[in-house]
Amino acid sequence: MTRENVAHNALRQEGLVKGKDDTWKWGTSFQGSSSSVWETSHLHFRQLRYHETSGPQEALSRLRELCRRWLRPEARTKAQILELLVLEQFLSILPGEIRTWVQLHHPGSGEEAVALVEELQKDLDGPAIQVPVLVKDQDTLQKVVSAPGTTLPPVLPGSHIAAEICPHPPTDLVAFNLQDPQHDSPAPEASALSQEENPRNQLMALMLLTAQPQELVMFEEVSVCFTSEEWACLGPIQRALYWDVMLENYGNVTSLEWETMTENEEVTSKPSSSQRADSHKGTSKRLQGSVPQVLDFEEECEWQVLASQWGNETDERADTVKKVSLCERDKKKRTPPEKQGQKWKELGDSLTFGSAISESLIGTEGKKFYKCDMCCKHFNKISHLINHRRIHTGEKPHKCKECGKGFIQRSSLLMHLRNHSGEKPYKCNECGKAFSQSAYLLNHQRIHTGEKPYKCKECGKGFYRHSGLIIHLRRHSGERPYKCNECGKVFSQNAYLIDHQRLHKGEEPYKCNKCQKAFILKKSLILHQRIHSGEKPYKCDECGKTFAQTTYLIDHQRLHSAENPYKCKECGKVFIRSKSLLLHQRVHTEKKTFGCKKCGKIFSSKSNFIDHKRMHSREKPYKCTECGKAFTQSAYLFDHQRLHNGEKPYECNECGKVFILKKSLILHQRFHTGENLYECKDCGKVFGSNRNLIDHERLHNGEKPYECRECGKTFIMSKSFMVHQKLHTQEKAYKCEDCGKAFSYNSSLLVHRRIHTGEKPFECSECGRAFSSNRNLIEHKRIHSGEKPYECDECGKCFILKKSLIGHQRIHTREKSYKCNDCGKVFSYRSNLIAHQRIHTGEKPYACSECGKGFTYNRNLIEHQRIHSGEKTYECHVCRKVLTSSRNLMVHQRIHTGEKPYKCNECGKDFSQNKNLVVHQRMHTGEKPYECDKCRKSFTSKRNLVGHQRIHTGEKPYGCNDCSKVFRQRKNLTVHQKIHTDEKPCECDVSEKEFSQTSNLHLQQKIHTIEEFSWLQNTNESKIEIQKI
């Protein structure tokens, strides 16, 4: 009867297993002492397997009953049960041989177990150990054991169970002194007495007696072999471990040589030689290739071949095994002594419950043999167990010579080396893509076939890989088993934890070969490299647009399908992207974890925080290759590049208008639908965004929340405040290389450079006029449309430009905040102050490229250049006169309307132009700021000074095209040209006489005034004389 069947019969007697015709019931037929029942129940409770039951309900019930039989809560107190659990754990942590010795004496408490351990330690400190060996043929045994350097195989794990059941080994044991092979064997009686008195002898005897196998195995099934190259790579510690493992296997296989009992009959007290010989022949065939045994060999072992692979080792283990492995072909049939038959039977009966334990080491086909002491995991090969143990110890013996990375298995190292060599031997036949591992190829091929064999039971989603399904299931369960020891953050995947830990270490192992930028993640490097290569492998089937990342493609496709899969549970708002939902949810939770140390501003996302820090550092890593403009964010760069390529991907479905930015389309669509429009309660004006409404409302309530700490000035908008602060810091980081002028913004520098290059990329579609900045074009278009969006609250006057409104409002408030340091004059506009300062410095930065003439103002240069080009774009609708500037047109139109908006406070005189009022006021104040360098004569206006200086220089720039006559002043040329044209636009109302000049008209009008005055005077004198009469 095999040990497995014996154990099964014992369990069946106990009532804890079912027979073929039995139904399950709790039996009470177990025979034996209470101690045996307790130990057996303990073993059955620990070693019950799920496949031994019919289902989970039965497994749970059996475990409960076995635990009750083991702990006996009806008879023991809580303290006693706790002591049993502690005793079990104490025995489990003892070394194997000591645990066997302690369990041999059945300690009832922890104190008894401690006493037994201390007793054994004292005995082990004595002289050399004498090992009792069960003798079958003393001559053959003497040949093997007495060989120089003979060592016995290690005890099988789990042998302490048999030692518990067989406390008294057979008496026919012969003690051999391992240190003295020539020592004579004592008599059996003396040997038995020695074993009873010396616990060491009992312990060592049990190591041999209790190594009972469950099933016979061949040595090849548990051996681990290395090639000569692999063996050369092993270190001393690894080779020592290999010797220990192989010796352990040798001990395990050697124990299988003992004769097995038949299933249906007990072992006879005197087995015949023929029975033993037949049994021995079958056993020897199974042991073919094993190490030399104490018993008989039928075949020559292959241990010598294995030893030859180890080379010339100097280790003592090598010498020992080589000597033991000199096998002899002993054909003698050995039989145990007849007087031992009864003891063999008792031993077989006592080993009934030992087979359950030996399952943990050597099992039947399909079972796992080797158990890890750390996590109790089982393995069917000891090489797998060795590799598994390295996970607990952290040992990584296989090192990469390129990067120093360590691996537990050599196969993992070989795969890793392909990363350095670039070798990808596995190629896809569909698309030609190559892979370094076959598993990667198999997973990739499922993309072509569409196969998703791993399905989620919760939502039905399919996955190409099993690992993907496991990770997905953690979303449903919320499980995040991987925790960071630094900050306590948890992750659903170990890879995410490794990547996160690089943040703490500052490690960036992936570096770009072109720009040397480093990244934490390899996928980030791959995506970054597509910026250099311009690769966009993911294409939309609807519109043909390509993307660098598959996530961008998925998000883009949702625009076509109008899918918004991510919904906020708080407010019901839906989003295309999950990250947008996460950012939105922080609005409800008010979770803002990223704080700026410089300004104290807090952000809910790390990306926004990084973008904000670039405002302080002025870092702009994203540069346009077309115009050189730099941006703080890549999204701004993408939007900017659409200006160059003319791309406007966002089209309104209502009116067909296209936009560069999606947010511009969203704001525009609100005007069609009326959805989410923000209306001002004071004036009814609507806005597309709440931010614009808030800024607008501050105009009504006068709120200016942004205050300058330097001068105390307040502002409605933050951007206006930031621009103002640069006046105090005089921070102008952007300098023009042509003229040296500095600017606070890079955009201002780009616009300024167009003055030097003459570039005007923004053209008006109505009149074809081009501008250097888009803002100027927008302002120009208002002239054609007649739009004047800026209205004065005091007088209701409207303006095209906001700065014009601000300047106009200063007329009402009489605010002039810009003061000249040289003469103390104040101005409403900063631009006027800058232009005024050029009077003191004599600077004329705007020069004509045709004649070289310089101008203080850019507008004067533009007007001057029209003289050369003959361009006159502004026509008067009344008299069809064409003028070179809109300002001149406005001044000219006042002649027809008679409008004179500028009035002198001193004398009440009105003027059509502000400059004429300023010159007139100098007559009252006596101010003459313009002085001639030659004669020191002063003038009230600069025009008079310029005309006077031409007397000294003799310059007469204005020539007549008809008679070639030249003049110092333009007005003189104008008057002269009327002689050729006979134009007399000035007509006297009294005499209806026409004049070519207004001055002549004024003289004629004075003549009529004098004549009228004389007539009245004469009339009054006549009336007086009549009254006297």
From Swiss-Prot:
KRAB domain location: 217-289
GO molecular function: DNA binding; zinc ion binding
Domain SCAN box: 42-124
Function (record text): May be involved in transcriptional regulation.
Similarity comment: family membership: Belongs to the krueppel C2H2-type zinc-finger protein family.
Compartment(s) where it occurs, according to its Swiss-Prot or TrEMBL record: Nucleus
GO biological-process terms attached to the record: regulation of transcription by RNA polymerase II
Keywords assigned by UniProt, alphabetized: DNA-binding, Metal-binding, Nucleus, Repeat, Transcription, Transcription regulation, Zinc, Zinc-finger
Main localization (coarse): nucleus
C2H2-type Zn finger ranges: 370-392, 398-420, 426-448, 454-476, 482-504, 510-532, 538-560, 566-588, 594-616, 622-644, 650-672, 678-700, 706-728, 734-756, 762-784, 790-812, 818-840, 846-868, 874-896, 902-924, 930-952, 958-980
Source species: Homo sapiens (Human)
Protein name per Swiss-Prot or TrEMBL: Zinc finger protein 197
Region (Disordered): 262-290
InterPro entries cross-referenced by the UniProt entry: C2H2-ZF_domain, KRAB, KRAB_dom_sf, SCAN_dom, SCAN_sf, Znf_C2H2_sf, Znf_C2H2_type
Cellular component terms per the entry's GO annotation: nucleus
